[in-house]
C-alpha cells in the first residue's frame, strides 16, 4: 500500500530538509562568490605569453585567460606603485588622497606635498565587502603607508582587512627579506610579527598565508588581496630555477627576470589548484593584473653593472608588448596593463574585450555589482561589470592621470615639470609630461604649465609615434581644458606662477 504524506507536512519538513542538505533558507550569503585580486608588481603588458611574450611561456597565468576573459584596454591609474594601489582599493583617483607618487620617507613625502599614508576613514573595497559579510585578507605588498621611517601609521586592518601579512612597505605582521636595506629599516619599526625569508620565497609564503586564511574563514565568502613583490627588481631567483634560463639569453638580467617570472607562474598555478581542490574555484572571481609597467631603473641597469664579458644590447628586462614607455611614464607602456578575469560559473571561456576601456579604480564598483552588494556613490570608478560578463562598453567619460606633482619645484625650459624626489625612467625618451587624458581613441599628454602637448590617436597609433597636436588643435583644446579642470579639482594646488 502506498501512503501519501499530507501537503502541510511536506511544507513543514521543507526547512528541516533545507538545513540537512546545507542550504540556509533566506540566507543569500551562502551563494556570494569569493573574490581574489592578484596584483603583480612591475609586470609589463607583454610579459606573459597570452599577451604576446614569445620568449617564455606562462601556462598557469595563460590558463586564467583561457578559462575567462582578457582585456586589451585596461589601465592602472598611475605608473607607480602607491597611487596605483590606492586607486584599486578606494575606487578613486589617488590624487584625491594626496598620493601621486610612491610613498617614501616622511621628508621626501613632505617635499612632494604627499601624504604619509592613505586616510583610514575612506571607503575601501575591503571595508565594503567586510560590512557585507565577507572575510577579508591582504597578503603581500601594501605600500599605502608604513616602512622606512614611517612606523606610526594605520595598520591594514584599519582599512577593512581582518587579516594582513605585508612586506617591508607596511606595518603589522609582515615578511621581510634577508640582506635587504628596506627590510632592515622595517624591522626596527615593531608593530607586528616579523618573518624573515629570501625574496624568491615570498610569493609562495604569501599564497600559503592566503590559503590558511581561506581555510579559517568558516562559512563566509572571502575577499583576498594577493600582492606579490614579484616581478619587481632586484630579481633574485632560486638558483635551481635560474639554471633553466642560462641558455635562453646572454643578458644576465633577463635570465634572472625569466626565472622570477617562471616561479611566479608556478605559484599562481598552485593557488588555482588549491582553490579547485577545496571546491571553491567554480564560484570564485579571480582577477589578474599589474600595478604599473616594467622597470627601467638606472641603479640596476647601467653599463657599469654589466659583466665585462657581456656583449649585446643594453636594456632592462620586462616587455611592454610594443607600447612606448615604461614604469614612471604616462605613455602606454607605463599604464596599460594585462588584465584577466576568471569566474568559471559566469564568464565564457577564452573571451576577449578590445572595446571597453577599464581602469583599476573601476574594479571596486564593478566587483560590488557582480556580487550583488551596494557600493559608495562618491567613487570615481564606474561600474563596468557588464563588460566582464562579455558585453563590451563604450566609454562615456574620459580617464585622467597625474604622475608626481612637485608644487615646490620649478619648470625646466623645454622639459617636463620638475618631479624631483620621484623616479624617472633611465631612458630619457620615456620621460612623459606629468598629466594625461584618454577620451575614446584620443590621448593627450601635457605638463601642468601647459607645455609639452602630445596628442595621439590610439586606435591608429597605439605605439604613440605620431604626435598630432599641431594638426588637431580643436581636440587638443577640448582635452586640455578637461584635464586641467580635473587637476584643479584635486587637493594639491597648482602653484600660481605656473597656472
Residue ranges with predicted function:
Residues 2-4, 10-12, 21-454, 458, ...:
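Formylglycine-dependent sulfatase
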Amino acid at each position: 500500500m502506498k501512503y501519501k504524506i499530507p501537503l502541510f507536512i511536506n511544507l513543514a519538513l521543507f526547512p528541516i530538509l533545507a538545513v540537512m542538505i546545507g542550504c540556509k533558507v533566506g540566507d543569500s550569503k551562502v551563494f556570494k562568490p569569493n573574490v581574489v585580486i592578484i596584483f603583480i608588481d612591475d609586470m609589463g603588458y607583454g610579459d606573459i605569453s597570452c599577451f604576446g611574450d614569445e620568449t617564455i611561456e606562462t601556462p598557469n597565468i595563460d590558463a586564467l585567460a583561457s578559462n575567462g576573459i582578457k582585456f586589451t584596454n585596461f589601465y592602472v591609474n598611475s605608473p607607480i606603485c602607491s597611487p596605483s594601489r590606492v586607486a584599486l582599493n578606494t575606487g578613486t583617483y589617488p590624487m584625491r588622497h594626496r598620493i601621486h607618487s610612491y610613498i617614501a620617507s616622511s621628508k621626501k613625502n613632505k617635499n612632494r606635498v604627499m601624504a604619509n599614508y592613505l586616510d583610514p576613514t575612506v571607503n575601501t573595497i575591503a571595508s565594503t565587502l567586510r560590512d557585507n559579510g565577507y572575510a577579508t585578507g591582504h597578503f603581500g605588498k601594501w605600500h599605502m603607508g608604513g616602512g622606512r621611517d614611517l612606523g606610526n601609521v594605520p595598520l591594514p586592518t584599519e582599512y577593512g582587512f581582518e587579516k594582513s601579512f605585508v612586506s617591508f612597505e607596511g606595518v603589522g605582521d609582515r615578511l621581510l627579506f634577508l640582506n635587504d636595506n628596506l627590510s632592515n629599516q622595517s624591522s626596527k619599526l615593531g608593530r607586528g610579527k616579523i618573518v624573515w625569508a629570501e625574496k624568491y620565497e615570498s610569493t609562495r609564503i604569501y599564497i600559503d598565508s592566503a590559503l590558511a586564511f581561506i581555510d579559517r574563514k568558516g562559512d563566509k565568502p572571502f575577499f583576498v588581496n594577493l600582492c606579490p613583490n614579484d616581478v619587481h627588481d632586484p630579481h633574485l631567483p632560486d638558483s635551481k630555477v635560474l639554471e633553466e634560463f642560462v641558455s635562453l639569453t646572454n643578458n644576465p638580467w633577463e635570465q634572472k627576470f625569466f626565472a622570477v617570472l617562471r616561479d611566479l607562474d608556478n605559484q599562481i598555478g598552485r593557488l588555482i589548484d588549491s582553490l579547485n581542490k577545496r571546491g571553491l574555484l567554480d564560484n570564485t572571481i579571480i582577477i589578474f593584473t599589474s600595478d604599473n609597467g616594467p622597470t627601467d631603473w638606472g641603479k640596476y641597469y647601467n653599463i657599469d653593472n654589466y659583466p665585462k664579458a657581456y656583449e649585446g644590447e643594453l636594456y632592462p628586462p620586462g616587455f611592454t608588448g610594443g607600447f612606448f614607455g615604461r614604469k614612471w611614464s604616462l605613455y602606454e607602456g607605463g599604464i596599460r596593463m594585462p588584465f584577466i578575469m576568471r569566474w568559471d560559473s559566469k564568464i565564457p571561456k577564452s573571451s576577449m574585450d578590445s572595446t571597453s576601456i577599464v581602469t583599476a579604480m573601476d574594479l571596486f564598483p564593478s566587483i560590488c555589482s557582480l556580487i550583488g552588494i551596494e557600493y559608495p556613490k562618491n567613487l570615481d570608478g564606474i561600474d563596468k561589470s557588464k563588460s566582464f560578463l562579455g558585453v563590451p562598453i563604450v566609454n562615456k567619460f574620459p580617464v585622467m592621470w597625474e604622475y608626481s606633482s612637485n608644487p615646490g619645484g620649478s619648470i625646466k625650459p623645454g622639459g617636463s615639470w620638475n618631479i624631483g624626489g620621484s623616479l624617472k625612467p633611465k631612458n630619457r625618451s620615456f620621460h612623459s609630461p606629468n598629466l594625461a587624458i584618454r577620451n575614446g581613441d584620443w590621448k593627450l599628454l601635457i605638463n601642468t604649465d601647459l607645455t609639452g602637448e602630445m596628442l595621439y590617436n590610439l586606435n591608429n597609433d597605439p605605439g604613440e609615434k605620431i604626435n598630432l597636436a599641431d594638426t588637431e588643435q580643436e581636440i587638443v583644446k577640448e582635452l586640455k581644458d578637461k584635464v586641467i579642470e580635473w587637476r584643479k579639482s584635486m587637493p594639491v594646488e597648482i602653484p600660481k606662477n605656473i597656472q
